[in-house]
């Protein structure tokens, strides 16, 4: 939820700042995209994207669009509240949490970023809010 997301990001930023370690911010949908893409009838390496969606009680459906090419995830549309009735095409997957697999992917992505010379500063890691806790802003 909203509060849990804020607390988790603040805790990660504080630990990275105080320990002087890099921090890589990746959305949970982007982490699961490579794993979930394997469930598609045809791998979307052709350039066509796919959607990951999650129903939020009393809020609607949150969705993000992704493309995976040789294991590299490209976020086409970040997770956001979808307009009711919006057509997403045929490649739509329900979000499926696998914390262990997604944490391993996050650590591998951080390691790859550091090998490539990226600094991964904690200051750039901010939460995303696909829905506003107070309504439209």
Map each language-model feature to its residues.
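Oxyanion-binding and handling regions
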Residues: 24-137
